[in-house]
């Protein structure tokens, strides 16, 4: 009976230790930056992403590239580096494929944008929003007089 008491006591003592904080997922860490992007506050998103420092995440690189491309004075050179890194980390990252394709159109590189579209088509076997968006951007680009 005494051994049962001691086992119960130690089991309770083990349970009473302070709970360790569960580490946040990358998605949770990036959520404030995503919210800033949705609000159109790209400078704030860049600051939040810099603070989050998730350089092993394709999503982080994609969001940084997007924010740099969409801010008031776009930085296409840096944005392109982030998209390329995102795609090196995840070759089928749909967001990076779409946004990099759009950046390539800004650089008047239709051939490269269409290559991103082809890669996106493979990544979205049954279609996806990113594929439709990049197709639309390419169609609009082609419709503009040059």
Protein language model annotation of sequence segments:
Residues 24-52:
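Alpha-helical segment of the N-proximal tetratricopeptide repeat
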Residues 39-44, 72-85, 107-116:
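Structural signature of tandem alpha-helical TPR/SEL1-like repeats
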Residues 16-26, 114-146:
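Terminal, low-structured helical/coil segments at or just beyond the last alpha-helical repeat
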Residues 60-62, 96, 130:
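TPR alpha-solenoid repeat register
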Residues 55, 89, 122-126:
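Structural marker of alpha-solenoid helical repeat scaffolds
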């Amino acid at each position: 009976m005494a051994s049962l008491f001691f086992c119960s006591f130690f089991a309770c003592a083990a349970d009473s230790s302070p709970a360790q904080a569960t580490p946040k997922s990358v998605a949770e860490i990036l959520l404030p930056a995503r919210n800033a992007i949705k609000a159109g506050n790209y400078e704030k998103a860049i600051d939040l992403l810099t603070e989050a420092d998730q350089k092993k995440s394709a999503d982080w690189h994609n969001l940084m590239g997007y924010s740099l491309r969409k801010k008031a004075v776009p930085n296409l050179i840096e944005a392109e580096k982030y998209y390329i890194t995102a795609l090196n980390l995840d070759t089928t990252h749909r967001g990076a494929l779409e946004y990099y394709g759009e950046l390539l159109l800004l650089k008047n590189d239709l051939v490269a944008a269409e290559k991103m579209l082809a890669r996106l088509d493979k990544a979205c076997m049954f279609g996806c929003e990113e594929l439709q968006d990049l197709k639309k951007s390419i169609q609009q680009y082609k419709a503009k007089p040059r």
